[in-house]
Amino acid sequence: MFGDSDGSKDANPGAPPSTTDPPFPNRELTLSSYLCEKPTLASAAAGGGGGAGPSSPPNPAAAAAGDDGKHCVERDFLHLSAPKRGDPPGDDSSVVGGKKPRLDSLQLSLSLNSDGPAAPPSSQPPLASLLQPVPATDGDLRGAAAAAAVPAAPARRTYSATTARTRSINSDDMSYSYSIFSHNPSCSLTHNSTDIYAAGEGTNGSVHSRFNFRPMGDGSVAFATPPLKEGTSSFFPTELPARMAAAAAAAAASAGGSFDGGRGGLHASRPDKILRDIVSDSVTAMAQVLQDFPSERLELLREAVRGMIDSHEKRDELASLQRKLERRSDLTTETLGRANRTQLEILVAIKTGIATFVTGKGRVPSSELVEMFLMTRCRNLNCKSTLPVDDCDCKICSTKKGFCSACTCSVCHKFDCAANTCTWVGCDVCGHWCHVACALERNLIRPGPTLKGPIGTTEMQFQCLACNHSSEMFGFVKEVFNCCAENWNAETLMKELDFVRKIFAGCEDFEGKGLHAKAEEVLSLLGKKIISPLDATNSILQFFKYGVTDYSVTGSTSKGILAAQASQSTDMRSLQTPTITPPKSSFNFKTTTSILDTDALKPSPKPLSIEPHFSTASKEDDSSLETIVKCKEAEAKLFQKLADDARKEVDSYRQIVRSRTQKLEEEYAAKLAKVCFQETEEKRRKKLEELKMLENSHYDYLKMKMRMQTDIQGLLERMEATKKMWV
């Protein structure tokens, strides 16, 4: 190499300097030249020690340290520069401005030239006998080995006089004592930098170095060496005191840490670094790595994914990982089938942004996880339908990959676990669902023309984005309340009533306005805790059943009635308060039967009696009774109005039926006449054919008759002639 030594550290102080060394006053000692051109013990024995000086006596302290059970190699790569001639002691020209420059990554090799001269002393034992490989305890601590320190100083090195400092590293006449591996000649140890942590990793992180130098947390350097072959010796100078603490290695293994030469210290393997590797590296390679991880480290990875998804500060990092996954084209069904279980859960959780996959709850089969990652199965663990649902080919299912029409909102493309609620609204035709809040924001719930009433009337409808079909909202809300309202608590009931109020806020029809007013009324009373949730539920159900409940008059009168009833029940706690049920309405609207229910016109067998309820009431309750009577009169007027509307609707339906019947009869007669005409034409054609056949046969008969008559006439004439001749 380019470096040389003046013998200030290697030679004996009493020995004269070598005559073969040219005087290079400014030469520097590089680590690669120091380690590659140092004579070996084996070659010294073969070469007879030519060109080498006497060695230093062995160091007893170092020998004692070599017998230690830790088998540590003490070296210091920070003090290997030979002092320049002419420089005062302690002068370090590499320190500029109080800062030490950072060195480039250098790949070091301790392979020695087999034909180089060496003359080690016979008293120095071979270093190969002192190096004992230590088995790896973790995937990150790969082959970290410790060796005993070398007690004796090495012999002085000889140099070729033909080697100049201006010689290029790639020149043809370069000495073959250099390592066959990659070296960075610009990395001189005379810089004395404390940042040469990647010295043993090679240029650009090469993995081909013979020795892996992995720094410890205290700045020292440890060697990881493969087992030495027979006949191969290795040399380490005594000027490299360093030690690898066994306690640090044990702490690294117990804490899940790793030696990272590129970062310069022992540190715990960060879960986010492993997550980035899982996202970017090969599936098979990471599956093998995760296979050796203990369950505690796998749980740490799951916890890191959950924290990344739930934390608002790490949304950018999550989005970055998702973009990396989207750019990968090698993630197929076959590739993901070879993935580790935890690896697959992490990939699905990162891609979908759902932390449920890494919580350990609701374990999903690996095949379904692969389908969820490839967006061929719904990612909702409560649904897990095969996509597209029912082979739907609407504009949403065909364009939005991974969209599930059975549980995902068609507007925001999100899902939740809500069920039996008015917060979701569905289409009657295609079955797509949507959040009510999203539909209201996009104005998908709006008044539309109705088919039930007269022409020009409207009702509140939901416009589906998938099929553009309009579904009426009153019947949907009515069905939800009839099926699910009894199981709701007070909080849920108030939330549902608030959504009902928002849905029918801009309604113009009679039913929608009444439901909006009823929802506001009951919601206000529930907020003031004037009525119980059970009474509120019964009031809403009575509204859906009869159109108007006991106290369903909008405005201040209705609120006053409910408040009066509440105060009355408070004053009469000792008395049993029977439930006052209004008589059944005269008209029962049913979709499966006729519009008018004639049985409802019959008088009720048990007339409503409210006298026992008010017989023991005080005079203060008379006003409440009068208010109730007025309320009943108002209800009677409303019922009469409903009856009139029903009669008008019946008349319109009858007129429609008549016109449709007449039109159908005309169409039927026309089709029947057309069919009969075709049949008649066919019969006429057949008759004409028969007539023609008869005419032809008759003509043949006449010709035969005429021919026979002619023949008979001729015979008669001949007979008369013959008779005359005989006479």
Curated annotation (Swiss-Prot):
Composition bias, Basic and acidic residues: 67-88
Segments of this protein annotated with the region Disordered: 1-136
Main localization category: nucleus
Comp. bias (Pro residues): 14-25
A cellular-component GO term for this protein: nucleus
GO molecular function: zinc ion binding
Segments of skewed composition (Low complexity): 104-117
Subcellular location: Nucleus
Transmembrane segments: none
Annotated tissue distribution: Widely expressed.
Coiled coil region boundaries: 629-697
Zinc finger (PHD-type): 406-470
Keyword line: Coiled coil, Growth regulation, Metal-binding, Nucleus, Transcription, Transcription regulation, Zinc, Zinc-finger
GO biological process: cell fate specification; embryonic pattern specification; inorganic cation import across plasma membrane; maintenance of root meristem identity; maintenance of shoot apical meristem identity; regulation of gene expression; root meristem specification
Keyword Zinc-finger appears in the UniProt entry: yes
Function per UniProt: Probable transcription factor that functions as a regulator of metal transporter genes responsible for essential metals delivery to shoots and normal plant growth. Required for the maintenance of metal transporter gene expression, such as IRT1, IRT2, ZIP1, ZIP9, NRAMP1 and NRAMP5.
Protein name per its UniProtKB record: Protein TITANIA
Gene: TTA
